[in-house]
Amino acid sequence: MSRYRGPRFKKIRRLGALPGLTNKSPRAIRDLRNQSRSEYRIRLEEKQKLRFHYGLTEKQLINYVQIARKAKGSTGKVLLQLLEMRLDNILFRLGMASTIPAARQLVNHRHVLVNGRLVDRPSYRCKPRDIIMPKNTTKSGVLVQNSLELFTGKELANHLNLFSTPYKGLVNKIVDTNWIGLKINELLVVEYYSRQA
């Protein structure tokens, strides 16, 4: 199953607000209370929210769930931490890109340095004390500056620091899962995959 490139509003109307997918919002959200929703549908919708918000393929999400199962702690919380510490998501949270697909494109087009080294993998797992900055070219700087101008006034995640001259982001610590701005029940996602196995 490939990455979703279709109409984004369709997914937002179905699943609710997904800030990583698009920064637009639908005019009116349908009332789904009259429809009966099976337990399977509820779990599937939670999984789809996670998948579309972070821009993952089904196979990538399965791999992250398997890694989270092997780690110590709550599988759901570890899964969210793994997804939040991806490079494309960190760029989105810092405001260097307006959406996660835009951040993914920045990384793929080789505009981003992590600790002074060029990284072209959006799935790169950032660690505490990583320094993320645009490449030392005018094009890279302009792309990041335009996104940061749109980002002004929004709250920065508590596990990140942003320095304005030169544009540079610092990962302070592993993300606290209570801070994630997405209404999701991660346990239902883990449950969905445990029933699939």
Curated annotation (Swiss-Prot):
Keywords: Plastid, Ribonucleoprotein, Ribosomal protein, RNA-binding, rRNA-binding
Matches recorded under InterPro entries: Ribosomal_uS4, Ribosomal_uS4_bac-type, Ribosomal_uS4_CS, Ribosomal_uS4_N, S4_RNA-bd, S4_RNA-bd_sf
CDD domains linked to this entry: S4
Keyword Ribosomal protein: yes
Principal subcellular localization: plastid
A Gene Ontology biological process term: ribosomal small subunit biogenesis
Residues annotated as signal peptide: none
GO cellular component: plastid; small ribosomal subunit
Localization, UniProt: Plastid
Domain S4 RNA-binding: 85-161
Molecular function in Gene Ontology: rRNA binding; structural constituent of ribosome
HAMAP family tied to this protein: Ribosomal_uS4_B
Oligomer status and interactors: Part of the 30S ribosomal subunit. Contacts protein S5. The interaction surface between S4 and S5 is involved in control of translational fidelity.
UniProt record similarity statement: Belongs to the universal ribosomal protein uS4 family.
Reported function: One of the primary rRNA binding proteins, it binds directly to 16S rRNA where it nucleates assembly of the body of the 30S subunit. With S5 and S12 plays an important role in translational accuracy.
UniProt protein name: Small ribosomal subunit protein uS4c
Organism: Cuscuta obtusiflora (Peruvian dodder)
Native organism taxonomy: Eukaryota, Viridiplantae, Streptophyta, Embryophyta, Tracheophyta
